[in-house]
Amino acid sequence: AVNRPDTIVLGMGLATLRAAKGNVCLETGNVQGLILAGLLFDAGEIKSDNLLVIGNEGQKSEDNGKNIYLSDLFFHVGGTDTDTPVSVKCCATINSNHVVGDNFWVWRADHGDNVAWEKNEAENGIIINGDDVTMYALMVEHFEQYQTVWNGDHGKVYMYQSEIPYDVPNQEVWMSHEGQKNGYASFYVDDAVDTFEAWGLGVYLYNRDASVELDTAMEVPDKNGVKVHNICTVMLTGYPGMNHIINESGDSVTFAGERKVICEYENGLIR
């Protein structure tokens, strides 16, 4: 645990932290001025709730003029040589306010040893609970529910890349909103959020193992102040398809190589 302000944790040669007993690999208190960089987090054979937790749950940090900086952080759920499947509930949870993230790759493995829907289980890639969190180059792939959940206000994302899981076995196990919607959007912004803005998003679909539908790539509350600029969806190959881009707006992608775009979205309107 890191509880002292202005601490720097720098991984030399991409230092790897692996959950051994269902534990969190690294967690911090609500302290400002932290810098974490150059770390790889691996899920373990005993399921953890998280691999990285920034800040205390339910206690957001005060604004003292110092951001927390998280750079070059990578997360693996499977994909390495192992005799036993690995799993985690969520790779990274950010509870603190005033966080800047740069270059996150959050990956549930789609190939390797003991990789399958009921083996390397992981619900979410990253959950943002803090306010004033900014992410640059956020890449989240193949998780079994929402790839990214954003609950904080005044969030900003510059470049987001995401692949929907390849290995969904059937539609019945992949339904959101208490079974009312097909699949889980890649990026989910909670209805309580009043201000959020994102630029340059790409969500990619490859239904490799079953014919299942994804209702929409991104869910946001339809409010003035919640804005999305330049988002595209692409069907890579496999079974179709993805029906919408944001909420119920945007055209579907249903054949290999098809790409659709929304340039500007706010409060239910495409501009």
Give, region by region, the residue ranges found by the protein language model.
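Extracellular/periplasmic carbohydrate-active domains that bind, remodel
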Residues: 1-271
